[in-house]
Amino acid sequence: MPRLTRRFHARDPVTLARALLGQVLVRVLDDGERLAGRIVETEAYLGVIDRAAHTYGGRRTPRTESMWGPAGHAYIYFLYGMHHCVNVVAQGPGEPTAVLIRALEPLEGLERMRAHRAGRRPKARLRDTDLCSGPAKLAQALALDRRLDGTDLVEGEHLFIERGRRVPAGNIVTGPRIGIAYAGDWALRPLRFHMHGNPHVS
């Protein structure tokens, strides 16, 4: 399948968050195995004006540098000292906005995903719907961490997004983002999007 282009990513984060639904996130492991999942849930982060964004107020740190760069790159951060989350940089240089990928519908490499998720509990048997139903879960399932932060999702070898299927506007559910109560009124804005009726959402 063809990959998404730079132009696809270079738009405002709300438009991109909706457009990413139905597209396919691909992770190629060091041994060549392909893991892939359809994007079924996203959240938009609007940069310097958004109290929930890591770049709110123009904050620029080594951790957030990827958000300030070109569209179509990965911004991967470590949360609570336990979990990684993967974002797609939107717009372009100097416009630090991004889309958080919240959930995937696993398509390829499910057994490898299951092994990654089981970790030290190799006998645990996770259902397909539990493999990638949350940002931390999908990062663990696909073996994503800070080493892949800044990866070019258009031209990269180990992490990229392929064109999937367009989700009609009528099949997209909109609501508030999750886990950002600290952001005041911004916590209530309808910036979370997911595919209606999909069992893999978080």
What are these regions (language model features)?
Residues 1-202:
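Conserved, well-structured core segments that form or line functional sites
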